[in-house]
Each structure stands twice: as C-alpha cells, then as structure tokens.
Amino acid sequence: MGQSVLRAVFFLVLGLLGHSHGGFPNTISIGGLFMRNTVQEHSAFRFAVQLYNTNQNTTEKPFHLNYHVDHLDSSNSFSVTNAFCSQFSRGVYAIFGFYDQMSMNTLTSFCGALHTSFVTPSFPTDADVQFVIQMRPALKGAILSLLSYYKWEKFVYLYDTERGFSVLQAIMEAAVQNNWQVTARSVGNIKDVQEFRRIIEEMDRRQEKRYLIDCEVERINTILEQVVILGKHSRGYHYMLANLGFTDILLERVMHGGANITGFQIVNNENPMVQQFIQRWVRLDEREFPEAKNAPLKYTSALTHDAILVIAEAFRYLRRQRVDVSRRGSAGDCLANPAVPWSQGIDIERALKMVQVQGMTGNIQFDTYGRRTNYTIDVYEMKVSGSRKAGYWNEYERFVPFSDQQISNDSSSSENRTIVVTTILESPYVMYKKNHEQLEGNERYEGYCVDLAYEIAKHVRIKYKLSIVGDGKYGARDPETKIWNGMVGELVYGRADIAVAPLTITLVREEVIDFSKPFMSLGISIMIKKPQKSKPGVFSFLDPLAYEIWMCIVFAYIGVSVVLFLVSRFSPYEWHLEDNNEEPRDPQSPPDPPNEFGIFNSLWFSLGAFMQQGCDISPRSLSGRIVGGVWWFFTLIIISSYTANLAAFLTVERMVSPIESAEDLAKQTEIAYGTLDSGSTKEFFRRSKIAVYEKMWSYMKSAEPSVFTKTTADGVARVRKSKGKFAFLLESTMNEYIEQRKPCDTMKVGGNLDSKGYGVATPKGSALGNAVNLAVLKLNEQGLLDKLKNKWWYDKGECGSGGGDSKDKTSALSLSNVAGVFYILVGGLGLAMMVALIEFCYKSRAESKRMKLTKNTQNFKPAPATNTQNYATYREGYNVYGTESVKI
C-alpha cells in the first residue's frame, strides 16, 4: 500500500514539473538523423539548440529544447528503419535530419504513417508528401530563368541522380518549346574521377562550351578540378552551378582561366543575423563542435540553423494557441501493423507549415506541401577580376540583373591591379643581380626577359610583379594525372596572369594557354664539351695539299725530268761539237760534253723550276723549252694554291669533334645524351615520328642513370664534368649563350633539329592576350628584340668571337706549326755533309789509285803508238761515242 502511494506521488510531481500553461510541456524533445558526411551540419544543429536554450529572453524561450541524435547508413535500409524507430520510441515531437535517394522513401513513408514531422535541409522533392518540411528552396525556376537570360540554346546538363530528375524534366520540356539542344548526363553514381574527365573530353570534342552542373558541393568541386586539369576553364566556357552554396565551392583555381561561372547563393553574408552567427561560430571549440572554427560555414549548416528556428517558432505558436501536444504514456511501436499515428502530429505539422520567420537563408515560409515559398536567391558571377552579385531571383519577379554594377572588362580592371608575371631563373633571361639581397620587388632581377617584361608592361600600361615559378619547370602535363606543372601550370590554374620566359610555343601548350607571336626563333641543338685543339703534326706544312696530290707531284717531277732527258737525247739542237780551232786546253781538264741535259741535270732543272729557283742550264731546243714551259706553268699553279692554303692551315688549330649531328649521336653508345626533365625539348622527342629521333627517345627514357636534368644549369654542368661523354640537347639560343660564357669549354655542333619560337603566354581567353601580342609585334618592328638579344648574348659575352682565344693568338705561328721545315733543313744539311764525306772518300781513293798508276807508268815507257783509235767521251757515267776519229 505504501509503495503504491509513493508511486502515485512521484507521477504527480512529474506531471506538475513537465507541464504548464494548459498542459504544454516545458521541454520539447526533437530528434536528429545525420549521415556520415554531415559533420558540420551536426555541429550547427547542436549549436543552434544551444543558442536557443541560452537565450535570456523568457518570452522568446518559453520552453527548453532537448535533442536525441542517431547516425544512419543510407545504404542499409535496416539502419534507416532502426534509426527512425529509435527516435519515435523516445517520444520526440519532430525529427530533423537528412535523406538521400535511397533513404528518402523509407523516411517519408514512416513520417506519413506515424504523423511525425520531418524537417530536412536535403534536396527538395516534387512529390506531394505530408509531414515533410523542406528547408531547401527549389532551384528549378531560377535555373530556367537564367537559361533564358543567357540565351543558352546548346549546353550540357550534368546532374546528380538524387536531385536532378525534376529539373531534367523541366529542362526537357523547355527544350522542346525553345528548340534547345541539351546533352544530359547523370553523374550521381560516378566514383572514379577519370570518368568525369572522359565525359568532359567527350563533350569538348562535340564543341560544347556551356555546362549546367546540378550536384552537391563536393561533387561540383571534383568536376571543376577535372575542368581545370584539362584546361577547359578558359574564355569561351560558361559553367552554371545549380547549387545554393556558390561561396562554398572552391573557385580559386578556376577564376583566373577566363571562363564565366554563374551560381546561386541562399545565404546572404551581409545579413546581420549571419554575421552574428559566424562571429560566435568561429569561436567554438573544435573538439566539441567539429568543422566549426577552421572550416567555412556551409549553406546546409545555415539551413540546419534555420530549421531549429522553424521548430522553435512552431512550438511557440502551439503554446500561444494552447494546443495540447504533450505525450502521455508510451509512444508506441513504429512497426505496428496497422500503424498507430500520433494524434497531435497533424497539429505540429500544421504549425510548422504556418511558420514565417527571418533566418540565415532569408525569408522562411512554406506552402501546404511543406515546400519553401516566397524566398529570394542571389545570383553570382565569377570572372578573372573576382566574384560579384549579378542579380537575384524570386518567384514573382523572376531573374532581376543588377544593371548598375556591370563588370568592367578584364583589360581595364588589370590596369588597377598588379599583374602576376611568372618566369623562371635561367641565364640570360632572368638572373639575380649581384646585390639582389639589398633590393626588393622587380629590381632584384635582370636579364633579357626582365627587360622584355618591362617593355611589354610599358606598352600595355599595366602594373606587374615578377614571380619565379616554384618548381623551376617550364611546363608539361603528367601523362597519368594530366596535371600541368611549371609556368604553364601557373597560368592554367590561375596563379599567374602572364608568363614572360623562354617558353616554347607547342601544340599541347597552345591547347590550354594562349601565346603571342614569337619574340625569338630557335631550334633544338646539341651541346658538347669543346674538344682539345689538335696539335699540328711535324709535317703539317704538307696539309694544304692532299697526300694524293703530293704523290702526283713527285711522279710528275720524275716524269718531266725523264721526258726532258729523252727530248734532249733525240733533239739535234741540244747537241754541240767541239771546235778544232779552239785554243789548246789544259790536258788535265775534262772535255765539255756535247749535250748538257743528262739525267741528273734534267732532275736538277725540274727541281729548280719547282722550287721557283734558277738553274745554270736551260733547254736550247723547241721541244725542251715546251717541256720546261708546261712544267713552269704547272709549278706556278701548284705553288700558288699551296701558298694560298698554307696560311689557313698553319694559323688555325682545328678541333676534332666526336659528333657532328643527331645521326652521329643516335648510332653510337659511348656518348650519353639527354634533355630537361620537363619541357618542350623532351616533348619533341617523345612525340616525334622520325626514326632517328624515335631511336634517341628510346635510349633516353631507358638510360641508367637518368639522362634527364632538372634544370639547364644541371645539364651544362654535366656536360662540363663528363669529359666529353655527355651531350645535352637544348634550345639553340641557350646553347649559343653558354658558349659565350666562361670557362668557354662548351660548343654547339651540327644544325638545329627543328624550328620553333619563344612566346609570351597568357591564360586561355585572357583579355591581356591581344594587348600582349600587339606589344610583342611592335617591339619586333622597332628592332628592340634584336637589340636585347645582342645586349645579353654578345655584348656581355666572355669568350669573344673566337670562343675564348684572342685574334692575335690564333694568327701567330708556333714552333710546332713549322717544326717539319726545320727538320728537313737539318736533315738536308746532314745529308749534304754525309754525301760530301762520301765524295771525299771516293775521290781520295780514286786519286790514290791514279797516283799509283802514274808511278807505274813512269817506270815503264812503251814504244809510241803509230795507230789511231776512237776517242770516247764520258759524261756523268754515260758513254757517248763520237762519229769521228780523233788523233792522240
């Protein structure tokens, strides 16, 4: 009996504490259903309840809000059912939560059957369902208004399966009426980002430039990332983002490309309520409220906050109307068959639909089906200069553009801002000054491109800031990720406005950025270490004529001498007889020969004529003189030609290069060769279909260690240190410049492998492109480009025109040049001494024999001879017999 009394007293106290004001509860319990990716929304939900409960105004807070939260897995229908039933069994008055395509039907069915109101910021549905209060406004009307305003007649519609069917149906109906060409693609179930890329590439092949993207923020960011990677964010493209969180989307990488981006914004950041909420929001403890302090507020979080306002306002209305919504007893079983609805659920639903309140998302009202009505959506545009509010849309006025805030064009706006000019540290284009640490801004740099950027800025009338590219690369696209690096990446991803650098104009780059007319023409060339100058040989004086010619001269000399000898033998005019009337001769002197051109005299005559010297004898006969004349003519031409070439051969020390062309490189393996790791030169070999270059690319990509260098300086250093075992392939202009720099040990060999040019680059479709192009053309016509090249290449050269040696040194002869002449002189003198010694010995021996013969003759005196005999005359070893008898 006592226990029964105590139990009765306990329930009486609970009833007195829990109910007041005509049976209205002091605590309103609401449920919360959240998915995995709604972390910030969960924090906003709890913070909004906290803000309401800590409100000091009792008229605004006649009751206390309490919540019960469950997390559900939308892919598991049992999890969805269990989460809802868990909330219903707790006796909550209303449920706030999210749904997707898989869980929407389950949740709305339970709400309709059990008369439990479900307040959601998820995508709105066109179905006429009861007990569902949709916080998110429908975008269908705003999208159709903007399509008409922009006069889109051909576009691509990318939609999320969960939300896009109703909009797709409306667009297709409008397309039939307006003769639009619409390509619709569902992207809701795509998990691989490569599929987004394939869709964009396919649409680009169809010349599609306009896209309507109807997805959640995360998916839009993924699609735009692929758009940027593919370079489809340039001028001429227009993207309309059918999402209420335009400021939530990551647009920093897209905005500088030049494409027009239009979107919708439901949260007005200039609203005092929004500003006040954000001030408190950023001061929250991240551990208690995840994604609050260090993450921007999402529009779905703002809708979550407004949902708590709507729930609180609805129960205020019920309290003012003295509607008894108190729960008595158990809430019942949500799975009961038949379902047992809550009797007060209709009153709560009616109160929620009657709410009209100002929230963070503007005016909040609902129609009889729980859909937002009488709302205003801001329309934003994003261009190079930034984003701005382009107008607004509502159900009555439709789209209203702001005509008094027209966007200024990019070129005029660029005059009022500092243009970022990306470049690369590469001599002589951009270099640090010696005292750069004491300077600031653009004054720290010098070089060809520094001067060129200054001249272009002066003509275009812009302010600019030089920015050195972070990765030190020119720009190439990764074959796997398709992401651009280097200066091209700076332009593609909007981190720079202009690139003034030795950036080669190529097809793949032209697809994603714009180039001016070339400011410098060049080609790929080969750099090698300058070989050692070949020392002249001992007989280098023979080099002016080929050895074949020398052999022919020797044979000609012998032949002429023999012919002269024979001609002198046969011609009677070369013979002369002794005169009997001549005065008596010394019996000891030899007689004069009747023919002077014996074989030795013929050789001596030919040698004297060849050496341009005289001779004591000369031909008397006409035939002999003909031989001498043609020989003199022959020697005149030969000696003149020899003398003409002798100066060049003796004064120039030639260098023997191991290679002379790309073909020489390709067919050998001793000398390695490579290019920059990222740039047009590497791309040239990778894409080339010429057999020689294909062979070179096959070698380079498989060579170990790698033959690709990070910078040009690394490649040059490798050439200098490799002792002639590495050749570097680079632009001819850089090759020529380095050849003029100390230590003057590199050289360019062969011709250019291709023909191309350097250009000033701008983002695709940038308004600066045309102005920059005109500036480059003007500078070229004025001759300033040639003047700049001469200034930085040759006027500041350190090796001179001879590659490091002065003119005086190259024209002076060294002993090694003429050593052979001295050797011949010494050899000739030595030979003469030896021959003289032999002659002396021979003559001494002959004289000794003659003296002995004379003594013997004196001792023996024979009788005088009475007969006559022929007198024989000897001349230089040959017997010439006379025809007459001479008396002795």
From Swiss-Prot:
Keyword Ion transport annotated: yes
Binding-site residues for L-glutamate, renumbered to this chain: P502, T504, R509, S680, T681, E731
Intramembrane ranges, chain numbering: 597-612, 613-615
GO cellular component, one term: postsynaptic membrane
Modified residues (Phosphotyrosine): Y871, Y881
Record field: catalytic activity: Ca(2+)(in) = Ca(2+)(out)
Keywords, ordered alphabetically: Cell membrane, Disulfide bond, Glycoprotein, Ion channel, Ion transport, Ligand-gated ion channel, Lipoprotein, Membrane, Palmitate, Phosphoprotein, Postsynaptic cell membrane, Receptor, Signal, Synapse, Transmembrane, Transmembrane helix, Transport
GO MF term list: AMPA glutamate receptor activity; amyloid-beta binding; glutamate-gated calcium ion channel activity; glutamate-gated receptor activity; ligand-gated monoatomic ion channel activity involved in regulation of presynaptic membrane potential; transmitter-gated monoatomic ion channel activity involved in regulation of postsynaptic membrane potential
Glycosylated position list: N57, N260, N374, N409, N416
Pfam families reported in the protein's UniProt record: ANF_receptor, Lig_chan, Lig_chan-Glu_bd
Disulfide bonds: C85-C334, C744-C799
Transmembrane spans: 547-567, 622-642, 818-838
Lipid-carrying residues in chain (S-palmitoyl cysteine): C615, C841
Alphabetized SMART domains for the sequence: Lig_chan-Glu_bd (SM00918), PBPe (SM00079)
Presence of the UniProt keyword Signal in the record: yes
Record's bilayer topology term: Multi-pass membrane protein
Miscellaneous field: The postsynaptic actions of Glu are mediated by a variety of receptors that are named according to their selective agonists. This receptor binds AMPA (quisqualate) > glutamate > kainate.
Family of this protein: Belongs to the glutamate-gated ion channel (TC 1.A.10.1) family. GRIA3 subfamily.
Main function: Ionotropic glutamate receptor that functions as a ligand-gated cation channel, gated by L-glutamate and glutamatergic agonists such as alpha-amino-3-hydroxy-5-methyl-4-isoxazolepropionic acid (AMPA), quisqualic acid, and kainic acid. L-glutamate acts as an excitatory neurotransmitter at many synapses in the central nervous system and plays an important role in fast excitatory synaptic transmission by inducing long-term potentiation.
Subunit structure: Homotetramer or heterotetramer of pore-forming glutamate receptor subunits. Tetramers may be formed by the dimerization of dimers. Interacts with PICK1, GRIP1 and GRIP2. Found in a complex with GRIA1, GRIA2, GRIA4, CNIH2, CNIH3, CACNG2, CACNG3, CACNG4, CACNG5, CACNG7 and CACNG8. Interacts with CACNG5. Found in a complex with GRIA1, GRIA2, GRIA4, DLG4, CACNG8 and CNIH2.
Protein name as catalogued: Glutamate receptor 3
Name of the coding gene: Gria3
